[in-house]
Amino acid sequence: MQVTLQAQDGGARALSLKLAHSEVQTPVFMPVGTQGCVKALDSRDMSEILNAQIILVNTYHMYLRIGIERLKNFGGIARFAHFDRSYLSDSGGFQAFSLNKNAKVTNEGVAFKSHIDGSKHFFSPEYVLDIQYALNSDIMMVLDDLVGLPSSEERIADSIARTSDWAQKSLIYHQSQKARGLGLNNNLFAIIQGGVNEHFRTLCAKQLVDMGDFDGFAIGGLAVGETSEQMYKTISFTTPLMPVNKPRYLMGVGTPENIIESIALGVDMFDCVMPTRNARNATLFTHFGKINIKAAIFSNDQSPIDELCDCYTCQHFTRAYLCHLFRSQEMTYYRLASLHNLHYYLNLMREAREAILQGTFSAYRSSFYALREMEIPNNEY
């Protein structure tokens, strides 16, 4: 991966990431394609209509649904899904924990049963990379030990010790693969854990950065029960610990407000199910805030979802039509609503990037909140 810092405005950064399948411009939002597709959309929607640069795919689900050998035979996820741009694959560890009440975590990895058929499986740091090699994703995530919040200091200490150990094993394995001429196009990111505790975050970050050869670094373990202020404070003391010449990825976050604040604090990459999940549940994002499209007030509203939006849905359909489709449980609703919400998120990234390049990100941030009639958060964390 070739990383170029194209501009910086305060803490906000605009990078170019040259990956095997495509070049990615940051700040970037990655739509979540859990099982090889973004729900209700296909690869043409993603590339031609939304112009998405990179999609997140879930290692756990692809492993259980398809398996390593079939993924290899298909030539990886990009060929299988006919999306000729980049993919980031997560490690699948979170799903192994969260979807299996009896999952057992040891220093060697995670033992779990398939939520599909009850079959037994084991994820080691090395094996999750084997799955991601089969996916042939541009960016692979190491296996990490995520803790929910609040958690005891003892549990957080165990988490960062295990996370660092697994990261070291992953790095050694990845380097051995590259020495054999394998995995040369697959970049490996480490994940910084530590809850909202500055001491533990600093300790984990130092251990991972000192390993030296990761292609990027992620902040994990947020948006799991902490307040927004705790989230922003944690990001503010974590990003300075991350190398300036590597991309910074905030995992699983979040709301448009979360993303704008995190960009200001130096984060480059984001993913979240929120735009598509909210779309399926009648919540649509606009420049002026969220609307609940199933509400009766919209049943005769002939305006677009968002008058400032130029997405496919807003160009062709009205609020009244979307309200009708949702209330009628028409499947077309899910596509049109998902297209709108994802366009909103992706356009937010494009606007933020342009502001950074022009040196006007602070003014852009102010206008973002002014349209919503919201106070600008105090970012003196």
From Swiss-Prot:
Note on how the cofactor is bound: Binds 1 zinc ion per subunit.
A GO term, aspect molecular function: tRNA-guanosine(34) queuine transglycosylase activity
Positions contributing to Zn(2+) binding: C309, C311, C314, H340
Pathway(s) annotated for this protein in UniProt: tRNA modification; tRNA-queuosine biosynthesis
Needed cofactors: Zn(2+)
Active site, UniProt feature: D90, D271
Keyword Transferase annotated: yes
Keyword Transferase: yes
One GO BP annotation of this record: queuosine biosynthetic process
EC nos: 2.4.2.29
Pfam families to which the protein is assigned, alphabetical: TGT
Reactions mediated catalytically: 7-aminomethyl-7-carbaguanine + guanosine(34) in tRNA = 7-aminomethyl-7-carbaguanosine(34) in tRNA + guanine
Keyword annotations: Glycosyltransferase, Metal-binding, Queuosine biosynthesis, Transferase, tRNA processing, Zinc
A Gene Ontology term for the protein's cellular component: cytosol
Residues covered by region (RNA binding): 252-258, 276-280
Residues that coordinate or bind substrate: D90, S91, G92, G93, F94, D144, Q193, G221
Stated role: Catalyzes the base-exchange of a guanine (G) residue with the queuine precursor 7-aminomethyl-7-deazaguanine (PreQ1) at position 34 (anticodon wobble position) in tRNAs with GU(N) anticodons (tRNA-Asp, -Asn, -His and -Tyr). Catalysis occurs through a double-displacement mechanism. The nucleophile active site attacks the C1' of nucleotide 34 to detach the guanine base from the RNA, forming a covalent enzyme-RNA intermediate. The proton acceptor active site deprotonates the incoming PreQ1, allowing a nucleophilic attack on the C1' of the ribose to form the product.
Subunit structure: Homodimer. Within each dimer, one monomer is responsible for RNA recognition and catalysis, while the other monomer binds to the replacement base PreQ1.
Similarity remark: Belongs to the queuine tRNA-ribosyltransferase family.
Name by which UniProt lists this protein: Queuine tRNA-ribosyltransferase
The species this protein was found in: Helicobacter hepaticus (strain ATCC 51449 / 3B1)
